[in-house]
Amino acid sequence: MRIPTYDFGSKFSVVQEVMRLQTVKHFLEPVLEPLIRKVVKEEVELALGKHLAGIKWICEKETHPLESRNLQLKFLNNLSLPVFTSARIEGDEGQAIRVGLIDPSTGQIFSSGPASSAKLEVFVVEGDFNSVSDWTDEDIRNNIVREREGKKPLLNGNVFAVLNDGIGVMDEISFTDNSSWTRSRKFRLGVRIVDQFDYVKIREAITESFVVRDHRGELYKKHHPPSLFDEVWRLEKIGKDGAFHRRLNLSNINTVKDFLTHFHLNSSKLRQVLGTGMSSKMWEITLDHARSCVLDSSVHVYQAPGFQKKTAVVFNVVAQVLGLLVDFQYIPAEKLSEIEKAQAEVMVIDALSHLNEVISYDDEVSMMRNVLNAPASQGSVAGIDYSGLSLTSLDGYGFVSSLHNTAECSGKHSDDVDMEVTPHGLYEDYDNLWNCSHILGLEEPQSELQSALDDFMSQKNASVGGKAHSKRWTKLFSVSRWLSVFKYVKLGKI
């Protein structure tokens, strides 16, 4: 009987290998198991998400059956014009161009489904392309403008964008060539969807036509609106170094401010400076452009010598008459008669020769506040003599009532308020009163008024207070009312 033999060496090595694997498994399993679980979980969630999104889109299509071209792209802001080559194409107020995916049935942004995150492409079409009709894909293809032979692509920059919840932003795009060589001499921008979607057609968006100029022309472009300190050739129909520009420079009209100032001072003379080469239509275009200039709110007040006291003209930074200050009342320009407007314009011309006598305010409100609330003892406000003004005429502005309210709040009776004013201007009005009444055939008021004035002045010089103080002011107010009536009669306003 033969005794079997065993290769204990090989079996021992097998046992060692098994033990080694068990050891590796013991150490690696705690590390690998969480990692594998995480990877599997992410893949499952991703697949499940795609599956659910597809189910949602199918449900939406079943609930709201989609028709051909049921969605459309639309530019959400206008292009900023003019457009120059190599310059960034911008929307209103320098913003990036924004495109929205619109549901025409609601007019709202379509922000659900795969189409709301589709890829967009910007392209160029002919300026005479009919963007009103319901164009076809073939119409678009036939009107796309390509670059000229040997030139760079017509659009430079990132011509692709992606919708985010139905809105896309087209940024950093510029033209490399002008539009003068095309059949319409204009371009339109278009945007279309690059991706294709089942059962869905999306209409392209097309802008209005516009001219693309060479960037060298940007140095000579007009400003809309112009600035007061822009050179005058920035106005429409006035070319740089052209005939109109030279004529204006010879008359020392160098800026838009100069142009507007001369227009308000003497429009017919300004028209003569430009000459017959500027037609009436061109003149209106230039003038409308100049008038679109944004002016500051400052106002300027001036009382010209030789005019009635208590009368001053109010004008703005370009010498336009805003109104008159007459007898402590502000009369806006639209309420002035033609004669008063002519007088006001003469006063403005005189003011420009006496700028040191012009008083400026931030706006009309601050002007009225300074004029109406100025202390009576000043005798003069904004260069206007108000020394003879009766306080009753201020009641319409709430001045007297506020004065009494102030006295009451401070614990004083209104009779105790010091309202001492020396009515110098009153004598001047009185001196002219007899002549006025005599010419008009009115009864001579001299004796009665003289008596009232003498009584007032005698009380003024005496040390009288309280009710007597109020009584003599009442008399003065009555006299002032008489003077107002006779003054209005003299001016023919009654």
Swiss-Prot record:
Protein's GO biological process: negative regulation of defense response to bacterium
Which Pfam families does this entry report, sorted A to Z? Calmod_bind_C, Calmod_bind_M, Calmodulin_bind
Region spans: Calmodulin-binding: 1-62
Give one GO term, molecular function aspect: calmodulin binding
**Known tissue expression:** Expressed in stems, flowers and root.
Q: Keywords assigned by UniProt? A: Activator, Calmodulin-binding, DNA-binding, Nucleus, Transcription, Transcription regulation
> What is its subcellular localisation?
Nucleus
Segments carrying the region annotation (DNA-binding) are 132-252
Tell me a GO cellular component: nucleus
Asked whether the UniProt record includes DNA-binding among its keywords, one would answer yes
Q: Subunit structure of this entry? A: Interacts with calmodulin (CaM).
Q: What is the purpose of this protein?
A: Transcription activator that binds DNA in a sequence-specific manner, likely 5'-GAAATTTTGG-3', to promote the expression of target genes.
Protein family according to the UniProt entry: Belongs to the plant ACBP60 protein family.
Please report the name of this protein according to its UniProt entry: Calmodulin-binding protein 60 A
